[in-house]
């Protein structure tokens, strides 16, 4: 049984679209070239960067690497941190991995939507990617916290091989952990992590070779030499170790750093010259090419932030820093003697081999003739550095040669009690108030003002349920709605300045539905237009369908019983890869690599009711102009025992009988051959003859599968069809038993009244079209689409640059993944894609105005006269009243006054108090209970005669500590 996926809708509010630079810290760097739009020749040299804001940048550094860097290209590639990037061999593509569990390919020189494609996915954060050096194959290895290493073909986006850690992967150190460091060549993949050792994998046998044990903390970075004989590793234990792969031993341990070493970089084929950066900001260069020379380790510079990645070329070093900045340093030695000798008086005058590195041998590849720890070959090549002092007392260079400044990202946010406004603060102290319903800034505040004091001054006594969540994980404000809570909040029309002034005082509007309708307005308009085109061509569809059925009858009489060819195109909807088009090859532009089609899910064996979506409460309700979305009355009532024999009144809107047919997958199915693929051409500019031809083909497929016509009579009964299928199955070979069972299930599924579970908006539209075909020929076919009314949910003036994201969550995945991302400006071009990936609950809301009904929260309360007022009881003091949490106090006041006026004629108006705080007429029961009563017990209201003048009212509402 497959677990249903959950879908979310996120829209992003960004007031700094034109800023150049990472909004948050940059995480990774790589040097390469930048090509022209045609990709024929490189234009300049480029530095590519990925950051915690999910963005990728390409910076122009010139052919001499000393140019003042300007951005060449940028893209919002991921919805979470970019953890690592690598460059393809031809420098035309940047491969990135992210905490959103995806590995993606970006072609910076491509300016259309195909510039970004998804290569593959992990089930948890992806921490590292590595491309074998000098390899001619389009392969990239990725490792993540799901404890897997996967090798991908980045040209076609397919998995080539995978390595998965076993529970006992590290017998010496401990249990398996995620992949935090990764390096690969043509034959071997090395990875490290929290298990503290380095694991070696053979790409030929696809098995783990051995483990290299020596570090005492997390292994943060790994480099492999060009010949594959040595490995250089950096660890959080502040050491850098050089390993011999043939001897499987630690040759040398470099301890020039006093803090965790996070980054390594080397372009030397034997790793004899390498750069290192640590958590304290220190960057060093180590050169062990000359044995007699004691000037091996040189401190280059020290920055104020940790070094998460470094690259170097010629006489420059680039390092990542905080606030999205990238620093460029001149690679000039600062000392004329060994750093260790300058720092420690007890440093040995010669270099000696480290002898304290533990190791573990593997009998699988151990060669007795290979160099060992004390072998002469090892002594001739490598040397050890020993010093334990830090660089804190040395005047290192702290001013970079050039700075690529980052943008300004949001660091702090707070949603106010009205659930419509959010206060944010960015990296430089700017404080802004956002209206997440109008999708724009509502105000700005001085940098010197305290954030918490601003929140207290802006917050109100309103208590609105949380209908959306907000975050600034990428340095920008993102608002997320999920299918379980987007309907939870309503506001009164007279409290919203975005609505008309003359709106009725008791009118309520749902915030989630309002914003969703406006975000997808282009989609709604396009589907209404397509729906009209389809209904205008129904006669052609029905006529051609009848002809096809007659032809099938004739074939059946001749003994050639075949399943209708329309069954397959009807139900199979090709789902394109989200956020990308079919990837184009980087290395061989002349070869056509087609994208892997989205896997088709078989129909459920026991299909559920028609138009049903699994939920906690799968009852759908239609929203009218006057009904409340919460489905609860505004007026309170005395709770009474329910009659168990009484059936609850449930109104299910728009659930006609739908004919369910089982999918029979033909050898080849293309998008153009599907039912919806042909129907969608109606909304495009084509000749009437072409339109009729398309609908004739569609009619054959749809009517043949359902076997039901406008008169409502069945052409071939399900029993006859089943009998025919059984005859064919009995005559078939025993090798075709599986196919026979499928046909039997198909005949059962094709019975009228057998519904299916709908998963996407495209399937919902198909079922609507099916219902149109079943209408009587002479009937006026009215549209079944009823989107949210404009009077109830008026149009909002939203910016066309707002980004909309649809993401999905599955239990097996560590986090959600984006399946659609676009701006409101470009949404009109993605209608076909949205039909395929938009979740059913969202399509049902946008096109049918139907949604799962929810029981509105209620508040229990009692009414008592204020002590000393002399007023009588309205109801028994032990009587508990109950009403919707959204009910305003004015309704309770009116009810109490009507009851009290029957006993006292001298009472003109009433005043309500709760805990000695005056309750204003517009307060809701939810606000009173959450902000004033603040207890789980029943709310107690005291009523008194209202003062004659406003000055006599002691309103303590403003003094509430909220």
Curated annotation (Swiss-Prot):
<feature type="repeat" description="WD 3">
    <location>
        <begin position="121"/>
        <end position="162"/>
    </location>
</feature>
<dbReference type="InterPro" id="IPR001680">
    <property type="entry name" value="WD40_rpt"/>
</dbReference>
<feature type="region of interest" description="Disordered">
    <location>
        <begin position="568"/>
        <end position="615"/>
    </location>
</feature>
<feature type="region of interest" description="Disordered">
    <location>
        <begin position="702"/>
        <end position="758"/>
    </location>
</feature>
<feature type="repeat" description="WD 1">
    <location>
        <begin position="25"/>
        <end position="69"/>
    </location>
</feature>
<dbReference type="GO" id="GO:0043130">
    <property type="term" value="F:ubiquitin binding"/>
</dbReference>
<feature type="modified residue" description="Phosphoserine">
    <location>
        <position position="717"/>
    </location>
</feature>
<feature type="compositionally biased region" description="Low complexity">
    <location>
        <begin position="568"/>
        <end position="578"/>
    </location>
</feature>
<feature type="compositionally biased region" description="Polar residues">
    <location>
        <begin position="707"/>
        <end position="723"/>
    </location>
</feature>
<comment type="subunit">
    <text>Interacts with ubp9 and bun62.</text>
</comment>
<keyword id="KW-0677">Repeat</keyword>
<feature type="compositionally biased region" description="Low complexity">
    <location>
        <begin position="724"/>
        <end position="738"/>
    </location>
</feature>
<protein>
    <recommendedName>
        <fullName>UBP9-binding protein bun107</fullName>
    </recommendedName>
</protein>
<keyword id="KW-0853">WD repeat</keyword>
<dbReference type="InterPro" id="IPR051246">
    <property type="entry name" value="WDR48"/>
</dbReference>
<keyword id="KW-0963">Cytoplasm</keyword>
<dbReference type="InterPro" id="IPR021772">
    <property type="entry name" value="WDR48/Bun107"/>
</dbReference>
<feature type="repeat" description="WD 2">
    <location>
        <begin position="77"/>
        <end position="116"/>
    </location>
</feature>
<dbReference type="InterPro" id="IPR036322">
    <property type="entry name" value="WD40_repeat_dom_sf"/>
</dbReference>
<feature type="repeat" description="WD 5">
    <location>
        <begin position="214"/>
        <end position="253"/>
    </location>
</feature>
<dbReference type="GO" id="GO:0005829">
    <property type="term" value="C:cytosol"/>
</dbReference>
<dbReference type="Pfam" id="PF11816">
    <property type="entry name" value="DUF3337"/>
</dbReference>
<dbReference type="GO" id="GO:0051286">
    <property type="term" value="C:cell tip"/>
</dbReference>
<dbReference type="GO" id="GO:0032153">
    <property type="term" value="C:cell division site"/>
</dbReference>
<dbReference type="Pfam" id="PF00400">
    <property type="entry name" value="WD40"/>
</dbReference>
<feature type="repeat" description="WD 6">
    <location>
        <begin position="302"/>
        <end position="339"/>
    </location>
</feature>
<dbReference type="GO" id="GO:0000724">
    <property type="term" value="P:double-strand break repair via homologous recombination"/>
</dbReference>
<keyword id="KW-0597">Phosphoprotein</keyword>
<comment type="function">
    <text>Required for the ubp9 recruitment to septa and cell tips but also for its enzymatic activity at these specific locations.</text>
</comment>
<feature type="repeat" description="WD 4">
    <location>
        <begin position="172"/>
        <end position="211"/>
    </location>
</feature>
<dbReference type="GO" id="GO:0051285">
    <property type="term" value="C:cell cortex of cell tip"/>
</dbReference>
<dbReference type="InterPro" id="IPR015943">
    <property type="entry name" value="WD40/YVTN_repeat-like_dom_sf"/>
</dbReference>
